[in-house]
Amino acid sequence: QAGPLLRRLAAEFCDSPLAARCTVALEIAPDADKAILDADAALLARAVENLLHNAACHNPGPVQVQLSAVRTGKTLRITIADDGAGYPPAVLHALQTGEAGENTPHILGLHVVEQIIRAHGGTAAFARNAPRGAKAVLVLPVTEDPAAR
């Protein structure tokens, strides 16, 4: 289930030394809480942890991070957004086009996130958060709960 996994990841992050650099707000919609994902929990955890780590480490000063999950039909949308500096334009360009120039910052962690989500039949999108900051949206297919049949 998605809800317990996301709550555990948020709690573990808040217990880590990186938590001193940010505040994490967790919001899981009731229909998303019990959504069942056909996913490797360790890999999905790595993707979310990478994004939380980026929010804490790639921003000056304290940053507010919002981790949320919403179910829409047969998909679960997990959003990690912050109010920090946001992704540099070169990073967004490299992620959207696959073309990394010599001045492109290191983006291996974001590529790992993309690969993990794609391997689970989903999509990962990275953008600037309005009015400021970075936003990653992970969309994953939800499997039907056999107990609900």
Where are these regions (language model features)?
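Short conserved segments within the C-terminal catalytic ATPase subdomain
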Residues: 16-28
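Conserved micro-motifs of the catalytic ATP-binding
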Residues: 36-39
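Short helix-loop "hinge" at the ATP-lid/N-box region of the Bergerat-fold HATPase_c
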Residues: 54-56
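Short beta-strand/loop element within the Bergerat-fold HATPase_c
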Residues: 64-74
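Acidic ATP/Mg2+-coordinating residue in the GHKL
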Residues: 82
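Short helix N-cap motif at coil->helix boundaries in the Bergerat
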Residues: 86-93
